[in-house]
From Swiss-Prot:
Species of origin: Mus musculus (Mouse)
GO BP annotations listed: blood vessel development; bone trabecula formation; cartilage development involved in endochondral bone morphogenesis; cellular response to amino acid stimulus; cellular response to epidermal growth factor stimulus; cellular response to fibroblast growth factor stimulus; cellular response to fluoride; cellular response to glucose stimulus
Name listed for the protein in its UniProt record: Collagen alpha-1(I) chain
Feature: compositional bias, Basic and acidic residues: 218-232, 1082-1096, 1197-1210
Function field: Type I collagen is a member of group I collagen (fibrillar forming collagen).
Annotated segments matching region Nonhelical region (N-terminal): 152-167
Stretches the record annotates as Nonhelical region (C-terminal): 1182-1207
VWFC domain residues: 29-87
Annotated stretches, region: Triple-helical region: 168-1181
Residue positions where 5-hydroxylysine is found in the record: 254, 419, 494, 740, 851, 1022, 1085, 1097
Length: 1453
């Protein structure tokens, strides 16, 4: 029955379930029972005595177990409850008789203990005393219920239910009050804790032995006797028959009431008494340690308005103005451009036939032949390697309890228990032989002190003192030595094909290699069939252009050309007369928001918000500590009978030993049967406290009392833990043959088989893909004059001519496109109210409202089901020594024992002379644990620790990008003959070549190794001998290796103290222009273009990575060196680009950082003292939360009066509720911070993208991020663009002053000079917020790059007489800046598009003597290239050449 579960316990367990449940996705399962839908894990009572639970979609029901044997005349039953109970005022007739009410005792602490008088007769039991103060904390609780109970709890957590309301923190306890007046005698309380021992009285004389009293109750079991001498081993008994394992029984009925427990140890201090009179104020105490972090204070008043932001960038260009008046007629234009080319002339006569062309390239392979018939199944392959473990399946529903398993193997022997206490004296033995000479008599006069004994064993570790003040941080460790190289990284993707290089000159002829061994004669091959004629080859390439034809006749005049471009703007005309006054301006934009008004009254509490989305599952925690010992298991089956021992011989009794030291108090035995009630004696007056006397002699053992009446059956017990595994059963019969296994993975390739017979030729293959264009052949002979070409495309527009005479008026133009949207008109008068619209759609779920008032305590939950039996837990730690067992039966007469221990000391002898100093005493046994010491003062600062161990090798970095392909070099001259090379390794197997003509019969080959039998192939057609095929392409990259094992999760560091809020930073510069749109998808590969004219020599490329050795190509015929073509004419300059648009407005300034947390509220007044609480519950289950502060749940009262009472004063419950609710509030705050970080210094987000997803309505601004997670002390401040989710990291020095930075020693020799590396006052660009550690920023940027797919950055180059990108004088980009990325790749203005940047504004194209600027933008998906760390201009070095830089933020998304 779960009636003992208190709602607060469920609340707290629910919170822990929330932590796990919130990070898992539990599918929504429910049960339908008699038309009622019940969520998974909920319990309900369809009938009063029937309880059901929804378990994974199935309703499981059971009867409620009741205690039917109620010992009262009129049991009562509450409405809706199944089980009856006795009213509280009813007293069972079986309870003890109540004696005469004693005099009312004075309240106050228990007095000192009186002396022990002679044992008197048992008095009648007195009136029940006042309720005692709270009992001591209970024993450690059972181990946590583990997975099954946690899952049952998590099912009870309803995702749709309201959140847990959380009150404020508990105030400090008030001072202890004075004792209250004595109350009326209450009901019988629990056994109070023993009072503090009184001052020891003087020892009284030993009284005379009193007469034997009436038989008393059975005493506690005696302390364990000394271990008996081991008997001789008996003969082995017969092996018992193995019993069948029984099935696990259902949980038993409620057991009988247990016996009263032992007196507990001294209890904790009771609850605070009523408030005493205020004392005189004490001196100020030493400052205490910093308290725990207070709850957030109330929201502060709005701060004063911030200072005005920096001026924004120029606004966008305004709309075009109205057209001006018609200008005067221009001068006549220049003559028109040459007319278009004339129409093609008639086709000429067919020319004479040219010489035969060069042999065409091999045709594409034919289509694949039809599939042949399936071959016979081959032999089974070797069994494949074991597959990887599959993903864990969905957990099945708990099964019914299985049959009790056989006992597991015997666990390891526990450590030897402590020495048992002395046993009761045995029965007197037979008189022994005369003993050896007795020990020396009583000690003489004390000798001089002996030497100091050995140091005693170290006592048990005391309770840890309070934490000392934190020591100062140690010195920063030096950098670790370089780690070992990491493992090879995964092969990078195949790089793009480089441009085909020009063929190099033929190398010198190598010296002849060594002669090969003659092969064994091969079998003569059969003559191949004549191959079918090949399909016609592809059309040959277009030949080189013929010589220029004769000049044609002048064509007719062309149509008039397109209107030329507008001429250069003339000088400004004279100032016009003043215009008419303009119209009234439009309504202005709304003014800035006014000052924030005073805070309004607190609104009413909103409705509870919907729970947030589930967070991601946390990483698996470390192995927890071993749990405390589990519940007592069910009794195991009776073991086989032991071997009977041989009867021992009667030993000679030894001398009576000296009394041993008093052993530790044994656990209290079960109470004996109740004795016969003695006659009531008169109540004597209360005596004065006497001094404690010596212990009296032990009385005779009383006769056993009559058995008491049977108690009521106890509550139904929780199911015990699963018993230990039994011994393994006998080997089962051989199982049936299993089903045929799945096909094994293909075996390794077998050894090469013998050459098969030549098959018939296959059918013609499908035409293959068009091969890549081969190198240009030598120029052919001059062909006949070709036919006139088609009309060429229109050439580029010529330069602008002078304006021609004005033309005649044109036709009326077509209707223009709609104009731009006009300015907003003045607001019209309000229209009449429209009819009421239909109700709108249901809005989205609102944000969570403020916390509602605390709900009333819910009714006790319904009874839960017993959980399924847990798995067998790991063996618990060795248990404490058990209580002493009952005395065994008297053994048979043993043999003569060893010499007895020393008898009691004889009468003291005469004092002897002082003895010599004794030897050093034996090491003393460890003393008992001392009380916890007061906290020590903080120790001095420790010396800095040694340098850390060299770090483990880092992971291998990503494979570098392939270098740019270098330009084709000019063919070198033929070199001298080289020395003979060694025979090269065979190249990779190429694809089969085209069918060739039949070959001649080869020599007989040597027999190959025997291959594994292949499937019978269908007889193939005989194929022609093919030509040598071209080398095959390199194979696809191998599959990536299996991911390495996940490293262990690091421990969470302690959260640092909140630092003081820093001063507001200066207003940052205006933001850079917004990012360009995302890069479009990559286009399809274009067809190979025709070969262009030979270009001019390019810049020298970077050295590429060494490629893998290519397969040897077939040797080509050495062609004659082609004639070098003449340099082409210089092309006309391109038309000037249209001017770029003005930049967008800058981003709004960042939001200020959140204000500091408010101070903790003042402590509330101390509450009124509550009555003493019930005894503490058993300790918490291991590994869970500490529930020891919860009030105990009420019990269903039975005739024993119940074990617990609910406190009458609700304040006790409220105080403890406050602790629970505070804990819950802290928990929920932490969960919320994990699931939805706020981007502050204490709670940084991972990236701005995370912040945007969690808080889509937040504005762009500066926030804190911690991409590598872990401790937040290395978080960095970045700018978050909330519209794009970009994380922008600013440089620590965003601008380089505009001045002359470099004077070249040789001004004529222009080369790129790196600003940070080579210029005298230059510096590399570093990134991060002000005051951040560059090493921390570098690590954070590494993680940020890994979590981003695109990066971009802008750099503005301010120039004076320095070209930044396009050189207006030459029209090329040879003087463009170089940028160096973070991975040291250089980014250029021209070349491979993957390593080039673009410009948004280019105002540095010529030397004008004035300052201009060029804005460079680089955007890439290779995030490791950004941010840019250095810039190298080329056009600098003269005294009048100056430049400066503005470095924009690197933005990642």
């Amino acid at each position: 029955m779960f009636s003992f579960v208190d709602l607060r316990l469920l609340l707290l367990l629910g919170a822990t379930a929330l932590l796990t449940h919130g990070q898992e996705d539990i599918p929504e399962v429910s049960c339908i029972h008699n038309g009622l839908r019940v969520p998974n894990g909920e319990t309900w009572k369809p009938e009063v005595c029937l309880i059901c639970i929804c378990h994974n979609g199935t309703a499981v029901c059971d009867d409620v177990q009741c205690n039917e044997e109620l010992d009262c005349p009129n049991p009562q039953r509450r409405e809706g409850e199944c089980c009856a109970f006795c009213p509280e005022e009813y007293v069972s007739p079986n309870s003890e008789d109540v004696g005469v009410e004693g005099p009312k005792g004075d309240p106050g602490p228990q007095g000192p203990r009186g002396p022990v008088g002679p044992p008197g007769r048992d008095g009648i039991p007195g009136q029940p005393g006042l309720p005692g103060p709270p009992g001591p904390p209970g024993p450690p609780g059972p181990p946590g219920l583990g997975g099954n109970f946690a899952s049952q709890m998590s099912y009870g957590y309803d995702e749709k239910s309201a959140g847990v309301s959380v009150p404020g923190p508990m105030g400090p306890s008030g001072p202890r009050g004075l004792p209250g007046p004595p109350g009326a005698p209450g009901p019988q309380g629990f056994q109070g804790p023993p009072g503090e021992p009184g001052e020891p009285g003087g020892s009284g004389p030993m009284g005379p032995r009193g007469p034997p009293g009436p038989p008393g109750k059975n005493g506690d079991d005696g302390e364990a006797g000394k271990p008996g001498r081991p008997g001789e081993r008996g003969p082995p008994g017969p092996q018992g028959a193995r019993g069948l394992p029984g099935t696990a029984g259902l949980p038993g009925m409620k057991g009988h009431r247990g016996f009263s427990g032992l007196d507990g140890a001294k209890g904790d201090a009771g609850p605070a008494g009523p408030k005493g009179e205020p004392g005189s104020p004490g001196e100020n105490g030493a400052p205490g340690q910093m308290g725990p972090r207070g709850l957030p204070g109330e929201r502060g008043r709005p701060g004063p308005p911030g200072t005005a932001g920096a001026r924004g960038n120029d606004g966008a260009v305004g709309a075009a103005g109205p057209p001006g008046p018609t200008g005067p007629t221009g001068p006549p234009g220049f003559p028109g451009a040459v007319g278009a080319k004339g129409e093609a002339g008639p086709q000429g006569a067919r020319g004479s036939e040219g010489p035969q062309g060069v042999r065409g390239e091999p045709g594409p392979p034919g289509p694949a032949g039809a599939a042949g018939p399936a071959g016979n199944p081959g032999a089974d392959g070797q069994p494949g390697a074991k597959g990887a473990n599959g993903a864990p399946g969905i957990a099945g529903a708990p099964g019914f309890p299985g049959a009790r398993g056989p006992s597991g193997p015997q666990g390891p022997s526990g450590p030897p228990g402590p020495k048992g206490n002395s046993g009761e004296p045995g029965a007197p033995g037979n008189k022994g032989d005369t003993g050896a000479k007795g020990e020396p008599g009583a000690t003489g006069v004390q000798g001089p002190p002996g030497p100091a004994g050995e140091e005693g064993k170290r006592g048990a570790r005391g309770e840890p003192g309070p934490s000392g003040l934190p020591g100062p941080p140690g010195e920063r460790g030096g950098p670790g030595s370089r780690g070992f190289p990491g493992a090879d990284g995964v092969a990078g993707p195949k790089g793009p094909s480089g441009e085909r290089g020009a063929p190099g000159p033929a190398g010198p002829k190598g010296s002849p290699g060594e002669a090969g061994r003659p092969g064994e004669a091969g079998l003569p091959g059969a003559k191949g069939l004549t191959g079918s004629p090949g399909s016609p080859g592809p059309d040959g390439k277009t030949g080189p252009p013929g010589p220029a034809g004769q000049d044609g006749r002048p064509g007719p005049a062309g149509p008039p050309g397109a209107r030329g471009q507008a001429g250069v703007m003339g000088f400004p005309g004279p100032k016009g007369t003043a215009g008419e006054p303009g119209k009234a301006g439009e309504r202005g934009l709304p003014g800035p928001p006014g000052a924030v008004g005073p805070a309004g009254k607190d609104g009413e509490a909103g409705a509870q918000g919907a729970p947030g989305p589930a967070g991601p599952a946390g990483e698996r925690g470390e192995q927890g500590p071993a749990g405390s010992p589990g519940f007592q298991g069910l009794p195991g089956p009776a073991g086989p009978p032991g071997e009977a021992g041989k009867p021992g011989e009667q030993g000679v009794p030894g001398d009576l030993g000296a009394p041993g030291p008093s052993g530790a108090r044994g656990e209290r035995g079960f109470p004996g049967e109740r004795g016969v009630q003695g006659p009531p004696g008169p109540a004597g007056p209360r005596g004065n406290n006497g001094a404690p006397g010596n212990d009296g002699a032990k009385g005779d053992t009383g006769a056993p009392g009559a058995p008491g009446s049977q108690g009521a059956p106890g509550l139904q017990g929780m199911p015990g833990e699963r018993g230990a595994a039994g011994l393994p059963g006998p080997k089962g019969d051989r199982g049936d043959a299993g089903p045929k296994g799945a096909d094994g993975s293909p075996g390794k390739d077998g050894a090469r088989g013998l050459t098969g017979p030549i098959g018939p030729p296959g059918p013609a293959g499908a035409p293959g893909d068009k091969g890549e264009a081969g190198p240009s052949g030598p120029p052919g002979p001059t062909g006949a004059r070709g036919a006139p070409g088609d009309r060429g495309e229109a050439g580029p527009p010529g330069p602008a001519g002078f304006a021609g005479p004005p033309g005649a008026d044109g036709q009326p133009g077509a209707k223009g496109e709609p104009g731009d949207t006009g300015v907003k008109g003045d607001a019209g008068p309000p229209g009449p109210a429209g009819p009421a619209g239909p109700p709108g759609p249901i809005g989205n779920v609102g944000a969570p409202g403020p916390k509602g008032p605390r709900g009333a305590a819910g009714p006790p939950g319904a009874t839960g089901f017993p959980g399924a039996a847990g798995r067998v837990g790991p063996p618990g730690p060795s248990g404490n020594a058990g209580p002493p067992g009952p005395p065994g039966p008297v053994g048979k007469e043993g043999g003569k024992g060893p010499r007895g221990e020393t008898g009691p000391a004889g009468r003291p002898g005469e004092v002897g002379p002082p003895g010599p100093p004794g030897p050093a005493g034996e090491k003393g046994s460890p003393g008992a644990d001392g009380p916890a010491g007061s906290p020590g003062t903080p120790g001095p600062q420790g010396i800095a620790g040694q340098r850390g161990v060299v770090g483990l090798p880092g992971q291998r970095g990503e494979r570098g990008f392939p270098g740019l392909p270098g330009p084709s070099g000019e063919p070198g001259k033929q070199g001298p003959s080289g020395s003979s090379g060694e025979r090269g390794p065979p190249g990779p197997m190429g694809p089969p070549g085209l069918a060739g003509p039949p070959g001649e019969s080869g020599r007989e080959g040597s027999p190959g190794a025997e291959g594994s039998p292949g499937r019978d192939g269908a007889p193939g057609a005989k194929g022609d001998r093919g030509e040598t095929g071209p080398a095959g392409p390199p194979g696809a990259p191998g599959a990536p290796g299996a991911p390495g094992p996940v490293g262990p999760a690091g421990k969470n560091g302690d959260r640092g103290e909140t630092g003081p809020a820093g001063p507001a930073g200066p207003i940052g510069p205006a933001g850079a222009r917004g990012p360009a749109g995302p890069q479009g998808p990559r286009g399809d590969k274009g067809e190979t273009g025709e070969q262009g004219d030979r270009g001019i020599k390019g810049h020298r490329g970077f050295s590429g990575l060494q490629g893998p050795p290519g397969s040897p190509g077939s040797p080509g015929e050495q062609g004659p060196s082609g004639a070098s073509g003449p340099a082409g004419p210089r092309g006309p300059p391109g038309s000037a680009g249209s001017p770029g648009k003005d930049g967008l407005n800058g981003l709004p300034g960042p939001i200020g950082p959140p204000g500091p947390r408010g101070r903790t509220g003042d402590s509330g007044p101390a509450g009124p003292p509550g009555p003493p609480g019930p005894p503490g519950p058993p300790g918490p289950p291991s590994g869970g939360y500490d529930f020891s502060f919860l009030p105990q749940p009420p019990q269903e009262k039975s005739q024993d009066g119940g074990r617990y009472y609910r406190a009458d004063d609700a304040n006790v419950v409220r105080d403890r509720d406050l602790e629970v609710d505070t804990t819950l509030k802290s928990l929920s705050q932490q969960i919320e911070n994990i699931r939805s970080p706020e981007g502050s210094r204490k709670n940084p987000a991972r990236t701005c993208r995370d912040l945007k997803m969690c808080h889509s309505d937040w504005k762009s601004g500066e926030y804190w991020i911690d991409p590598n997670q872990g401790c937040n002390l290395d978080a960095i401040k970045v700018y978050c663009n909330m519209e794009t989710g970009q994380t922008c990291v600013f440089p620590t020095q965003p601008s380089v002053p505009q001045k002359n930075w470099y004077i070249s020693p040789n001004p004529k020799e222009k080369k790129h000079v790196w600003f940070g590396e080579s210029m005298t006052d230059g510096f590399p660009f570093e990134y991060g917020s002000e005051g951040s550690d560059p090493a921390d920023v570098a690590i954070q940027l590494t993680f940020l790059r890994l979590m981003s797919t695109e990066a971009s950055q802008n750099i503005t180059y301010h120039c004076k007489n320095s070209v930044a990108y396009m050189d207006q004088q030459t029209g090329n980009l040879k003087k463009a800046l170089l940028l160096q990325g973070s991975n040291e790749i250089e980014l250029r203005g021209e070349g491979n598009s993957r390593f080039t940047y673009s410009t948004l504004v280019d105002g540095c194209t010529s030397h004008t003597g004035t300052w201009g600027k060029t804005v460079i933008e680089y955007k890439t998906t290779k995030t490791s290239r950004l941010p840019i760390i250095d810039v190298a201009p080329l056009d600098i070095g003269a005294p009048d050449q100056e430049f400066g830089l503005d470095i924009g933020p690197a933005c990642f998304v």
